[in-house]
Amino acid sequence: SWNRLVSLELNVDNAWASYESDVMMKFQTLPDLHEIVKGFAKHEIAFFEQLFIARQAASGALVAKNVGDFNKAQSALAQLTPRFNALSEAYPEVKADSHFLDLSRRLVRIEERLADRREFYNSEVTIWNKAIQMIPTFIIAAVKGSQQRELIDVPDYYHQDYKIQF
């Protein structure tokens, strides 16, 4: 029914908003980490530029609710994360900095929440996509102009071992 489709669509939008909120928290934490590390690793400026270009692309796609572009930007950002962690390992004074430790822990908690929210969003999208393809709701979905939604990808990086190269 029409009401069921409206309800399902609102569930997808709500799940996206929850995910978006945590991604924005992550994006707000990254500049703080950047400021701490850049004081110790000034010769890594090119890396930090890559990190923030990827962050801006992901942020723009997130605000535009463009899941496809967000998936691409998030993948680029995820590939830079191990290098960021390696920088903290390479500079013991960074690793010992209490602000860095606090922010790193915060980032880990945010990443854990993001994984949960991504799973919830993808579940809601799957329910939505199934509903708009089934009889008789596909007729109502067509009248309503409903379209399939994209899932949030888990970047390939998370499924493989990563070797850090400088």
Protein language model features and the residues they cover:
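A helix-centric hydrophobic-segment signal that preferentially recognizes long
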Residues: 1-166
